[in-house]
Structures are given as C-alpha cells and as structure tokens.
From Swiss-Prot:
Name this protein carries in UniProt: Alpha-1-antiproteinase
Entry's localization field: Secreted
Site annotation Reactive bond: residues: 376-377
Lineage, opening ranks: Eukaryota, Metazoa, Chordata, Craniata, Vertebrata
Domain remark from Swiss-Prot or TrEMBL: The reactive center loop (RCL) extends out from the body of the protein and directs binding to the target protease. The protease cleaves the serpin at the reactive site within the RCL, establishing a covalent linkage between the carboxyl group of the serpin reactive site and the serine hydroxyl of the protease. The resulting inactive serpin-protease complex is highly stable.
Source species of the chain: Mus caroli (Ryukyu mouse)
Length: 412
C-alpha cells in the first residue's frame, strides 16, 4: 500500500422535512408543560453555538444564495471520526465542534451523542425522524476493534466492505445506503469517490413533520417575495390566523415566530426588519434562541409563509477549516486509530447534502376556518415576503436539526 493514502469522508445529510397539517389548537392552551420539559442547552452535543458558527461561515461565502444544512449530520460524522484520531488531530476536531475539553470529558461527549441519536430515532406516531451512519472500508483493510466497537455502540454505525478501486461499485454502495435511509429523497449523494479513497463515512437524517396547526391550502395564494430591493418573484404564499407564538425582538430587530410540529420539534422563524438582515446574522446567539424556546409569547396573529423546496450541497473542507479543523485534511493527520494497517490516512473530502420541503399538505384542520374569523380587530401580520432565517429544533435537548436562510424561495 502506498504511503500517501487519502481517506474520503462523504458526509451526506439527507434531510427531508415535510411540513403539513397543523392540528387545530384550543386558543386557551397554555405552554407550561412544554416549558418544563426543556432542559438546559449544555446537555446537548449539537449545540446552538456550532449551528450559528456554521451558518455565519456559509453566509460569508454568499449573501445572495439560500442556505440549508444539517448540523446534526456534520457534528455526528466528525465526532464519530474523532474516535479514530490521536494527538492534535483529535483535539482539533472536538474543539472545532465547540466542545470545552476542560469541562467535558471525551467519554461524556460520545455518550451525549449516543443519547441524542437514541432520542432522535425513538419511534413516534406523530412524526418520522431517523438517522444513520455507515462506515465503508476498502476490502483489503480492517478496522481497529476499539474504533469499530465505539462507533457501533455510540453512533449505531453500520460497516460495509467496498472495493474502492471499482468506483462504480463504491458509488452504488454509498448511494444505495443514503437513498434507502432517506426513502429516496437523496438518490445521488456522491458522484465519483476520489480515486485514492480507502474509507468513507456516510451519514443521513430523515425528518418528516406535521404542523400542530395546519395551513389550509384553500388560503394559499400567489404573492410577491422581495429577494432584494430590485428583484421580486412570485411564490405560493400560505396563510394562517390564530393564537401563535409571535413577538418582536428588539435585540435582533426582528420578528420571531415559533411553530410547533406534532412531537417535540419546533421551527423558529426569524424575520428581520427592513435592512436589518446583517444585524440579525451578527447578533443572533444561542442564549436568545434558548430564551425564545423557553419563554413563549402566544397572541392572536396572522402569518404569511412561502411554500418552500430547498436544498444545500456543500464541500466542508474549507468550512470546517475556518472553525479550526485543519490538520485532518493534510498529511499531518493522525488517524491511526481507525485501521489496523500502518498506513497514513488523511481526510480527502467532506461533503454535506440536505433537502427540505415545507408546505401545507396534510390532514385537514376542521377549526382553521373558525380561527380565521376569531379577531374582532386586525391582528399583527407577519409577512415572510422577504429573506428570513429558520432553525428547526428538537426541544427536549434544544438540538438544532437543521438551519436555513431563504433568500429566493423559487431557487431549489
């Protein structure tokens, strides 16, 4: 085996969020039980701070493009990878993922990932959320037993033997794994594995959620969306009127809307005041998001939200380097804890692919028309007809499942 073997990590986040059907809520409902069930954010390995850091790095690349990624997939894959790292490479990964190694032990980090993956994969009749990890190893190599055992126990990783010299065969194994896990939503996760690849790591997450309060398709109409000061596009705009979690945050100069799914998932939408998107992006922090989730502001309001179909496809090498994770991508990487063969490995490629669909489809809401007629005077109106940010969160752990920015909803 040659002394310079590249390890191709294919970090493939298959996120499919189907957002139909809000079941009607009684307007007298309170949020006490919901608030009491949310733990402190430090209990989660997928912290909000990392989501914001990743978002800002992607935002720096372009201010005119939609953004959509899964922090869950990115963090899971790199944390799992750290099981086979040693020395500075190992430390860089965990610190780059925003862990304070003086306060949290490595064992606790991996146990926290184990707990979160168990939480996310727990059967729930109200929504579908599943994740998966696959380790694909060249057929002439063997994984270190300790790495294999810890990856399986903490990250539920499946292991596949692949002949990477046959690129079509390797591509099919990887794509079949991701396509099956995402129920066909991501059919081609990878086009051509690098020719020197001997090990690949594939990760996916599938999420299908239904709104607690459904949008009535009868009220969806074509409307204008202002991409910028000179560009306007036509989009299908959904409308909902009722008791909603809505308030204006003066710190962010933005309106905040929280929309719950059936099950313990919540979407946080952030609509900046005119000209305040940059201020929102620079000021947003984990403390504010946590506060929004804990302190609800229910009021009568009307919301106009565009129907969405987004995707994100990113090469993570540069992105993660900006977070301080550099050694793993060069010849100084120490990944000797992965394979038994004494061959130097480095990470040749890391990629993230995510898909989102957000619409009003689903069960009919019998009380939707009644809610439309509730106000005696016009309620506050939130019109998401200009660029906005959204974060979908697992509430028990305050773990961000994915983050997005909508600049132009007509771009997929």
């Amino acid at each position: 085996m040659t002394p310079s073997i590249s390890w191709g990590l294919l970090l493939l986040a298959g996120l499919f969020c189907l957002v139909p059907s809000f079941l009607a809520e009684d307007v007298q409902e309170t949020d006490t039980s919901r608030r009491d069930s949310v733990p402190a954010s430090h209990d989660t390995p997928y912290n909000l701070e990392l989501s914001i850091s990743l978002y800002r790095e992607l935002g720096h690349k372009s201010t005119t493009s939609n953004i959509f990624f899964s922090q869950v997939s990115i963090a899971t894959a790199f944390a799992m990878l750290s099981l086979g790292e040693k020395g500075d490479t190992h430390t860089q990964i965990l610190e780059g993922l925003q862990f304070n190694l003086t306060q949290t032990s490595e064992a606790d980090i991996h146990k926290a990932f184990q707990h979160l993956l168990q939480t996310l994969n727990r059967p729930d009749s109200e929504l579908q959320l599943s994740t998966g990890n696959g380790s694909l190893l060249n057929n002439d190599l063997k994984l270190v037993e300790k790495f294999l055992e810890e990856a399986k126990n903490n990250y539920h990783s499946e292991v596949f033997s692949v002949n990477f010299a046959e690129s079509e065969e390797a591509k099919k194994v990887i794509n079949d794994f991701v396509e099956k896990g995402t129920q066909g939503k991501i059919a081609e996760a990878v086009k051509d594995p690098d020719e020197d690849t001997v090990f690949a790591l594939a990760n996916y997450i599938l999420f299908k959620g239904k709104w607690k309060k459904p949008f009535d398709p009868k009220h969806t109409e074509e409307a204008e969306f202002h991409v910028d000061t000179v560009t306007t596009v036509k989009v299908p705009m959904m409308t909902l009127t009722g008791m909603l979690d809505v308030h204006h945050c003066s710190t962010l100069s933005s309106w905040v809307l929280l929309m719950d799914y059936l099950g313990n998932r919540t979407a946080v939408f952030l609509l900046p005041d005119d000209g305040k998107m940059q201020h929102l992006e620079q000021t947003l922090n984990k403390e504010l998001i946590s506060k929004f989730l804990l302190n609800r502001h229910r009021r009568l309001a009307q919301v106009h939200l565009p129907r969405l179909s987004l995707s994100g496809n990113y090469t993570l090498n540069t992105l993660m380097s900006h977070l301080g994770i550099t050694r793993i991508f060069n010849n100084g990487a120490d990944l000797s804890g992965i394979t038994e063969e004494n061959a130097p490995l480095k990470l040749s490629k890391a990629a993230d692919k995510a898909v989102l669909t957000m619409d009003e489809t689903g069960t009919e809401a019998a009380a939707a028309t009644v809610l439309q007629a509730v106000p005696m005077s016009m309620p506050p109106i939130l019109n998401f007809n200009k660029p906005f940010i959204f974060i979908i969160v697992e509430e028990h752990t305050q773990s961000p499942l994915f983050v997005g920015k909508v600049v132009d909803p007509t771009r997929k």
